[in-house]
């Protein structure tokens, strides 16, 4: 199926200060946005796609100056794809605190003329949703046909349905959770500790030193990447295969250099990530993950937290996802059903772990295609 083709981002500037959940106020900020498809006359066919930890506004298509720059969900969004841009107007927003053009730690603090660095305020999922709502306002979109996301993006979709219930017709929440478990918070803490203990971190102000805490960021990514894959998937891809420069397949080096294929893979992923991602952004986004817990204000009662939602829901999980296991999605489903909301739920049998939500799986895509067909019929798209 064809890609949407060449796309270009746009930068939106906001002068009205944004009060964050922490109490900090962010003024004169910018958000980078990409759109695909055409907004209909009734402005009823808009879909917001929320991104996960290391992704961005670049959901689909490619950039003219880099044909390898395929959007992170290009298999899902485009002409004739499950989220069909011939029928829907799709928006991707790069969240505050990111390192892909929206205001974040790498941006210049107007009060100092230097990068914010560690002084950039902690942001939350709720802060992102408020900022995204201003993007919707700028496009004149009063109500989204759907807000959709996977993983951390799914948390944003759920938050949209809570915070702006009248502005969301459908919430599509994939491979997500209503809150992080202690184990997930622990993984994030180990990853942050790797960054914070890197000598090149310099308290978060490494920009002034002309360095990046690549060693810490590399380890953080390696830790995270392990949690995105299933044990079966890793066994299938790597097993205990050895990686030897001399071509020998059955002998150990008896050293601490790379011996196994899985070690080589993790180091490659870590090095690649450390080259393009920002360490301060990693700290911010993992903390936003930790803080997300809409039931907290309701004494841990998720049913009470979701009582005022109005959207219809599609909740999807993957059988081998142990980062955000199917049981976490079922918690959301139960709370919605307790509130007599309209909910569709699917647990997809897939071997790829948490990352399955990014992959081109026929059953998964058919599910989304059918659901968007239903939405298209509702809005006349």
UniProtKB/Swiss-Prot annotation:
GO terms for cellular component: cytoplasm. It catalyses: L-homoserine + succinyl-CoA = O-succinyl-L-homoserine + CoA. The active site is at residues 151, 321, 354. Transmembrane segments: none annotated. Gene3D superfamilies: 1.10.1740.110, alpha/beta hydrolase (3.40.50.1820). Pfam families: Abhydrolase_1 (PF00561). Keywords: Acyltransferase, Amino-acid biosynthesis, Cytoplasm, Methionine biosynthesis, Transferase. The record marks 323 as: Important for acyl-CoA specificity. Substrate binds at residues 221, 355. Belongs to the AB hydrolase superfamily. MetX family. Homodimer. This is Homoserine O-succinyltransferase. It comes from Burkholderia cenocepacia (strain HI2424). The lineage of its organism: Bacteria, Pseudomonadati, Pseudomonadota, Betaproteobacteria, Burkholderiales. The gene is metXS.
């Amino acid at each position: 199926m064809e890609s949407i083709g060449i796309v270009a981002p746009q930068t939106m500037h906001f002068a009205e200060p944004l009060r964050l959940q922490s109490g900090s106020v962010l003024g004169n900020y910018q958000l980078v946005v990409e759109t695909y498809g055409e907004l209909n006359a009734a402005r009823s066919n808009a879909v917001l796609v929320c991104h996960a930890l290391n992704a961005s506004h670049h959901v689909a298509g490619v950039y003219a100056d880099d044909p390898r720059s395929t959007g992170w969900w290009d298999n899902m969004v485009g002409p004739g794809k499950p989220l069909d841009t011939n029928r829907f107007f799709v928006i991707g927003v790069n969240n505050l605190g990111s390192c892909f053009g929206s205001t974040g730690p790498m941006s210049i603090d107007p009060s100092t003329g230097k990068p914010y660095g560690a002084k950039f305020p902690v942001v939350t999922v709720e802060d992102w949703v408020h900022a995204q709502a201003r993007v919707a306002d700028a496009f004149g979109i009063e109500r989204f046909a759907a807000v959709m996301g996977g993983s951390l993006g799914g948390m944003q979709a759920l938050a949209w349905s809570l915070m702006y219930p009248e502005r969301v017709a459908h919430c599509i929440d994939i491979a997500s959770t209503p809150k992080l478990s202690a184990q997930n918070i622990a993984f994030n803490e180990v990853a942050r500790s790797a960054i914070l203990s890197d000598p090149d971190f310099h308290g978060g102000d490494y920009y002034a030193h002309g360095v990046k805490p690549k060693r810490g960021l590399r380890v953080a990514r390696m830790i995270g990447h392990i949690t995105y894959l299933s044990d079966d998937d890793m066994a299938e891809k790597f097993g205990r295969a050895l990686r030897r420069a001399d071509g020998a397949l059955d002998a150990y080096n008896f050293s601490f250099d790379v011996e196994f294929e899985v070690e080589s893979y993790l180091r490659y992923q870590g090095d690649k990530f450390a080259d393009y991602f920002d360490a301060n952004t990693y700290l911010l986004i993992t903390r936003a993950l930790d803080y997300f817990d809409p039931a907290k204000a309701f004494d841990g009662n998720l049913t009470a937290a979701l009582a005022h939602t109005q959207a219809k829901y599609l909740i999807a999980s993957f059988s081998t996802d142990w980062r955000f296991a199917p049981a976490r999605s079922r918690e959301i489903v139960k709370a919605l059903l307790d509130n007599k909301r309209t909910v569709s739920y699917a647990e997809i049998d897939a071997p790829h772990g948490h990352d399955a939500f990014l992959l081109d799986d026929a059953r998964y895509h058919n599910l989304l295609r059918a659901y968007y067909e239903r939405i298209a019929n509702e809005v006349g798209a």
